[in-house]
């Protein structure tokens, strides 16, 4: 991880050089290789994109040069793809998926189940009452499998469930998971079911649990414990997605290393 963070700092330094050199008379050539080329023997380099990023010529050129994987920022989330039960809107997600197909860029699917940006029809009835577990599971299965099946030719991995672990100190007697409507209906089991439904739709896709503040020691341990329980229960989970909301003030590199090493 130290190598990854330091490489990002070096990249910023590299791009600062042309802006300074342009004050002189020398002409600085446009780079042809990007970060994806520098790290091709180690890992993929990705970015979060929206529809504007993949339709603007300058941004397209940058994406194609620097990245070999992209993630849809919002276009594949539950609310944008199925705002009402059975009424799908594929326009933005299709645009990003087609961009990846044309340019040979891999696509990370984000996200199939999240307490935010999700239609309330998924978990409650017209009167605002929570659905039974059976009805909720039926809605969730239909949604997940429709989305995964549509993009299985281009999406190589999915963030199946997003941000289900509670933040901060957990009070005695309270669950370690976020008390979302989905959790209130089915408890931790809804996470397991989401992964099962995604795996049924695309057995070849890598499936991840995704969250933020992963470098905070107490939360990283809760995330680790959740995924450990999932693995022990036979749930098809392949890894943990760590949202990199990092800046010069934090988190501490030692905490990031510790989270990865759990």
Where are the predicted features?
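Short hydrophobic-acidic sequence motifs that mark active-site Asp/Glu residues
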Residues: 46, 157, 239
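Boundary/entry segment of secreted carbohydrate-active catalytic domains
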Residues: 24-69, 73
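Aromatic- and acid-rich polysaccharide-binding/catalytic face
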Residues: 68-72, 162, 201-211, 223-250, ...
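Acidic-and-aromatic substrate-binding clefts and catalytic sites of carbohydrate-active enzymes
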Residues: 48-58, 78-91, 165-166, 213-222, ...
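Bacterial Sec-dependent N-terminal signal peptides
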Residues: 1-24
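Short helix-terminating capping/connector loops at secondary-structure junctions
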Residues: 40-41, 102, 153, 235-236
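Substrate-binding cleft and catalytic face of glycoside hydrolase catalytic domains
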Residues: 32-33, 65-83, 92-215
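Short, acidic/polar
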Residues: 50-66, 93, 137-147, 218-230, ...
């Amino acid at each position: 991880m130290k190598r990854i963070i330091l490489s990002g700092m070096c990249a910023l330094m590299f791009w600062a050089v042309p802006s300074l050199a342009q004050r002189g008379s020398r002409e600085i050539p446009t780079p042809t290789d990007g970060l994806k080329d520098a790290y091709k023997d180690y890992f993929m380099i990705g970015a979060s994109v929206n529809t504007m990023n993949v339709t603007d010529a300058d941004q397209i050129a940058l994406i194609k040069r620097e990245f070999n994987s992209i993630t849809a920022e919002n276009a594949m989330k539950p609310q944008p793809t199925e705002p009402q039960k059975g009424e799908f809107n594929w326009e933005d997600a299709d645009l990003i998926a087609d961009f990846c197909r044309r340019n040979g860029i891999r696509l990370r699917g984000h996200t199939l189940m999240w307490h935010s940006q999700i239609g309330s029809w998924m978990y409650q009835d017209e009167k605002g009452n929570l659905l039974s577990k059976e009805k909720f599971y039926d809605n969730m299965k239909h949604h997940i499998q429709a989305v995964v099946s549509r993009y299985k030719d281009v999406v190589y991995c999915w963030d199946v469930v997003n941000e289900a672990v509670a933040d901060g100190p957990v009070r005695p007697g309270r669950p370690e998971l976020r008390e979302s409507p989905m959790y209130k209906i089915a408890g931790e089991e809804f996470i397991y079911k989401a992964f099962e439904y995604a795996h049924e739709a695309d057995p070849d896709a890598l499936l991840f649990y995704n969250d933020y503040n992963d470098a905070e020691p107490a939360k990283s341990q809760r995330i680790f414990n959740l995924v450990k329980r999932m693995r022990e229960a036979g749930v098809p989970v392949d890894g943990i997605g760590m949202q990199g909301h990092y800046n010069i003030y934090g988190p501490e590199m030692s905490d990031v290393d510790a989270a990865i090493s759990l």
